[in-house]
């Protein structure tokens, strides 16, 4: 089984991991739809797209309907859209918590539910979430983000068993820090707050990775593509870490 001719939806597809994942699926012959919140960023990728805020369930359903009408039933969903904020737990507000849960957890649920009927009808499907090492361990000052990402792994493990006889597999990819524009902004934030050099700030973030490097977007994308291959047909309910041995 290959992804050639299969309809793949990648959320958060305008940049970083999502954009790289979409490109690698296109190169593998898939019919890809990317989704994101702003049209201009999506247009730049030169891949068919739908504007969609994954936290808005009605918008998700409409976007999937439009994508389905254009490119056929959905076979693969890479739920990649996400966000993180840093705040001490004592200052975590209910709204900040809700925001983290909405994009990082509810967004995954909304997208997977939108594609589930197609996958069940086909007797084959791949539900993939871009999670994080924060799905499996704690980090300071990102308690809401860690809680949401831990929940994604719980969702993944539950659905894997629920859907095990349908031909659908459900997995989460859990990378450490990935070298993206978002990471660059995080490094700049450390520099501005501490006066560190860019190199020193980068080393702080690399410290948990025994390989002392950042994960690259093609590693995450390649893992998603592998999960759609015959070689991974028994891989179900897993949280696959890409962290150089951190976890």
Model-inferred region functions:
Residues 211-242:
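C-terminal substrate-recognition "lid" of short-chain dehydrogenase/reductases
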Residues 164, 169, 235-237:
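Short, small/polar-rich loop/turn modules that mediate ligand/substrate recognition or access, typified
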Residues 88-89, 96-101, 205:
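Substrate-binding pocket helix/loop in short-chain dehydrogenase/reductase
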Residues 132:
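Residue(s) in the substrate-gating loop at a strand-loop-helix junction
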Residues 117, 161-162, 233:
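Alpha-helical segment proximal to the catalytic Tyr-Lys
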Residues 112, 148, 156:
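Active-site helix of classical SDR
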